[in-house]
């Protein structure tokens, strides 16, 4: 899933960069428009699978059930066996349509939290002017994640998460309570997050949430906690001003 602003220097790549690459021609929409490239990529994966390598393939930028069905049809046409078929949940459209997407016969769904947050909040995380309001723990993002995990559980589809959010302890606690199957983390956070997950999964008080009332209560708790953290950041502890006469006493 490479955008036009990311591959412009590659040999044979189009030289024109789209005005808005983030919302442009990439992901599954590009693959379906160029079936010869798409099939070549899948055949390379098939070759690895036929040699006994175990892996899964997930398709990015899904916004419709039709895209999943078309990708699945090509996947089956090439007789790709022993390869898990999955989708990225990185657009609000995919989150909304998750029930129908699961019914297409997917094996797993993986959250792309970086893009899901950007698309949901209409925020460019690379823009310094709006960094203060870019937040994967935003109420709207969490509600989508919760809904997708619960639907995947019902349909027997595995759920996972990638992106930076999986390295945040507060997000991990939320995900474990929702019942997510796997979490991808940054290498430097792997030890801390692994220990946290072990604690959460062995803590008798931490149980998966299974009903609407508990889900609503948990979301409210996360929202309240997030607001308290932001409030603390906006109102730091007052700094004591030391008079000149006292400075001499301190440093002597």
Describe the function of each predicted region.
Residues 1-222, 226, 234, 242, ...:
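Conserved alpha/beta-domain cores
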């Amino acid at each position: 899933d490479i955008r036009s602003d990311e591959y412009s220097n590659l040999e044979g790549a189009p030289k024109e960069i789209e005005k808005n690459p983030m919302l442009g021609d990439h992901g599954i929409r590009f693959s379906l428009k160029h079936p010869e490239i798409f099939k070549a990529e899948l055949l390379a994966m098939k070759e690895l699978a036929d040699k006994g390598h175990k892996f899964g393939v997930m398709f990015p930028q899904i916004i419709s059930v039709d895209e999943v069905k078309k990708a699945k049809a090509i996947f089956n046409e090439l007789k790709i066996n022993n390869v898990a078929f999955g989708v990225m949940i990185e657009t609000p459209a995919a989150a909304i349509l998750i029930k129908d997407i699961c019914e297409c016969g997917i094996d797993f769904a993986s959250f792309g939290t970086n893009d899901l947050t950007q698309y949901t909040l209409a925020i460019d995380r690379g823009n310094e002017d709006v960094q203060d309001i870019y937040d994967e723990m935003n109420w709207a993002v969490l509600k989508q994640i919760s809904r997708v995990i619960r639907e995947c559980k019902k349909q027997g589809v595995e759920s996972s998460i990638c992106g930076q959010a999986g390295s945040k302890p507060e997000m991990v606690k939320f995900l474990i309570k929702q019942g997510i199957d796997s979490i991808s983390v940054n290498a430097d956070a792997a030890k801390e997050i692994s220990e946290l997950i072990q604690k959460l999964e062995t803590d008798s008080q931490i149980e998966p949430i299974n009903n609407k009332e508990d889900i609503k209560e948990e979301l409210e708790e996360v929202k309240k906690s997030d607001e308290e953290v932001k409030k603390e950041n906006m109102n730091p502890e007052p700094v004591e001003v030391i008079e000149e006469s006292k400075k001499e006493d301190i440093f002597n």
